[in-house]
């Protein structure tokens, strides 16, 4: 996978967490934002044992499964989201969670799979907007679809522009956010960054969350485009504005790695591991340790990455296996 796609996909995962209403599910949301996916799933499952039709619990369980990074459980997430829609057809957020689960299934299955699911993904997000015009997450999700999907799959700039304009009439600040997303998608990163930073979400926690997500996205895109100084600057701004953010330290470390600043990168990766113990972080640590000539530590890091049965990209897994053999040989 190209570096741009990898980094932006990583940032997009962060956006999975905003489909629950903060006012009605703050405990769940705290667990998800802290990447405590097993705990969130257990809490949701416990709730469902008592209230089988609980929309919040079904949404949280769906997002916890997706957030875990276990690709083999994506169909389970889709099924849970479908049950949410069936039990709560008028719940906007159930439809959004289904769109996200189908999106994960499509991304995991490749281009042909994406084409097959595109219509259902789009329709789920559109239904979310239709049922609740003030659902910011539904609007952001639909905008992401329009930006990412080509016209033949139901996306396109004209639809994205129309959505941003219509959103501005309902939720002005959200309209500005969607326009910033459109600008970022068109490569106008400085303009997008300025608009995102200038947003005034007030007490709207959901809009605050998406402001954070999109600012991370701009920083990650700078890094992916090899504009490392700009990427670091934006991501450090994220750390100042949103101290609990999970993604900024990883993005900064990746920028440092790409510049050969491996000692600095290791500090950031270690910080990331404290909050996000994922296989790709161990893999990146292995790369930096190897570059510094610390063979034994590099092998240990690669082996930690390989110990995860799921969640490590095929290319990374293959490379980690090759590097371990070479380092031990």
Model-derived features: where do they sit?
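Alpha-helical adaptor scaffolds
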Residues: 144, 208-275
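TPR-repeat structural position
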Residues: 37, 71-74, 118, 157, ...
């Amino acid at each position: 996978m190209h570096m741009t796609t990898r980094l932006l996909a990583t940032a997009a995962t962060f956006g999975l967490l905003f489909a629950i209403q903060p006012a009605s599910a703050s405990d769940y949301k705290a667990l998800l934002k802290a990447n405590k996916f097993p705990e969130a799933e257990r809490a949701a499952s416990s709730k469902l044992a008592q209230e089988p039709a609980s929309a919040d619990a079904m949404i949280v369980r769906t997002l916890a499964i997706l957030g875990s990074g276990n690709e083999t459980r994506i169909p389970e997430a889709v099924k849970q989201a479908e049950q949410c829609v069936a039990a709560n057809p008028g719940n906007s957020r159930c439809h959004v969670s289904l769109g996200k689960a189908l999106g994960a299934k499509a991304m995991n299955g490749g281009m042909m799979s994406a084409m097959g699911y595109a219509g259902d993904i789009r329709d789920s997000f559109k239904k979310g907007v239709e049922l609740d015009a003030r659902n910011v997450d539904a609007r952001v999700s639909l905008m992401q679809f329009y930006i990412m999907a080509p016209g033949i799959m139901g996306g396109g700039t004209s639809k994205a522009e129309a959505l941003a304009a219509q959103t501005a009439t309902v939720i002005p600040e959200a309209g500005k956010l969607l326009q910033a997303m459109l600008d970022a998608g068109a490569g106008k990163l400085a303009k997008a960054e300025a608009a995102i930073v200038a947003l005034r979400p007030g007490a709207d926690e959901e809009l605050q969350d998406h402001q954070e997500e999109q600012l991370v996205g701009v920083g990650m895109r700078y890094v992916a485009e090899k504009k490392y100084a700009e990427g670091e600057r934006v991501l450090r701004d994220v750390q100042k504005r949103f101290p609990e953010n999970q993604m900024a330290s990883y993005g900064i470390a990746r920028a440092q790695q790409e510049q050969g600043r491996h000692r600095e990168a290791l500090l950031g990766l270690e910080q990331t591991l404290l909050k996000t113990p994922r296989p790709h972080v161990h893999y990146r640590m292995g790369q930096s340790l190897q570059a510094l000539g610390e063979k034994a530590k590099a092998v240990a890091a690669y082996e930690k990455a390989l110990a995860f049965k799921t969640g490590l990209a095929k290319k990374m897994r293959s490379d980690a296996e090759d590097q371990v053999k070479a380092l031990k040989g």
